[in-house]
From Swiss-Prot:
The active site is at S62 (nucleophile), K65 (proton donor/acceptor). Hydrolyzes N-terminal residues in D-amino acid-containing peptides. One of its GO terms (biological process) is proteolysis. The keyword DNA-binding does not apply. Belongs to the peptidase S12 family. Keywords: Aminopeptidase, Hydrolase, Protease. Residues 477-487 are annotated as: Important for specificity. It holds the Pfam family Beta-lactamase. Homodimer. This is D-aminopeptidase. It catalyses: Release of an N-terminal D-amino acid from a peptide, Xaa-|-Yaa-, in which Xaa is preferably D-Ala, D-Ser or D-Thr. D-amino acid amides and methyl esters also are hydrolyzed, as is glycine amide. GO terms for molecular function: aminopeptidase activity.
Amino acid sequence: MPNIDLPTLEAFVHAIPQNYKGPGGAVAVVRNGEIVLRHAWGFADLAARKAMTPETRMPICSVSKQFTCAVLLDCIGEPEMLDSALAAYLDQFGDGRPAVRDLCNNQSGLRDYWALTVLCGAAPEGIFLPDQAQNLLRRLKTTHFAPGTHYSYCNGNFRILADLIEQHTGRSLADLLAERIFAPAAMKTAELIPDTALFNECTGYEGDTVHGFLPAINRIHWLGDAGICASLDDMIAWEQFIDRTRHDENGLYRRLSSPQTFADGAPAPYGFGLKFEETGGKRLTGHGGALRGWRCQRWHCADERISTIVMFNFEGNASDAALKMMNAALGIPPAKPVRAQANPGWFGSWLNPETGLVLSLEDAGGGRMKARFGTGPEIMDISGENEAQSSMTTLRRDGDMIHLARKDENLHLAMHRLKGEARQDIAGRYRSDELEADLLLVSEGGAIYGAFEGFLGKSDMYPLYAAGPDVWLLPVQRSMDAPSPGEWKLVFHRDAAGRITGVTVGCWLARGVEYKRL
């Protein structure tokens, strides 16, 4: 490829504080192992007036997952070495237990444990300890799809990996990372700090320019799925290590970033803690990270030996910034989607009965729709009267049915339009035997509210909103991890006499949790 258009790249970076508004951040571009651009702006602590620098450490959150998998490959070998240990760990399972490779590739079908903390009554700013993580993970008995068939993001996969690695080696993950990964890569200040409450070198902020920026409170303990704190310079060193070892057939990053497949042979979007993407026909590998008050993203294009890194101490769209930086470095112009006018027949709520997932669509103007299906809203471009797509999802409408496809997830669902009114007779207490947790629904002044109760406590009351007959939505916008699970979908079941017998509760991260009415 030709040389990087440095003025264009610098112009984009210098506009980041205006386009991604927040207290501060740090970004870098690396090509051929050399630093093309290294920049920090703003403040690491607004009250203390402490400036942000490339040496400022921040939590890299889920970017940590690739390093957990790197320790696995470097210290133990192929994932199958730990399959017997995983069987002992998930000893509540009958059939359908995932393999360790499924964990590494987010194909386990296990429900995300941070989402499940909501169902177990956790407070968003509550304390979450290591024994509570094991308590939750070891009680699991089922998956929400057959392992190896689909992709679903699951932090618990990597929490379990960390436990298995420590058990197998007899050493802490912190020591293994320092010795086997950080030292060889010259990541001089990178460190695993599992307790988020202990990190105080830089402040993460929640909020925005409308509501103001407030210091985020985090008191969770995480391991394997996240927990590493590193500076921009540490992350640059990681990209340089990747470039130095690019020709080594057994090089760590080559092994981490090797293509993966589903059980049916279809290409998978994720492997060994890395997300696989494509831009302008070029393959990218990388990962994002999020915690209340923090966002980060790294991408690497092996074909062109280019990496981009974005780290924010606020909840800005670091993934968007990192991809746009990569496109600028690669000389890929912004896409210009062709849009059609929205047909009102799109709008409303649509249910897939098999998974209990709900798709909600509303007009976003300019030939676009806002879709709610996963953890957050997606903006869909309407490309024809009955077709729409985003970067993740393709929709094809056929009357009162939408065919939803998420190619990266190997997922194809028939969504049926919800018609009619929801009955109000859902108040009561419901029990999940697998989670040993309750859902309490009450009616106050004609409005329905719900709360979750379990071994982590009793949640606040949340309002419910009707989506259609026996289908309700319960939005949860703050939880222990970030982003939050989003809207919980509640699909109620009745007997032949029309009495409520139970409810299926789920979201994209944790589908099909069955509750019976008490």
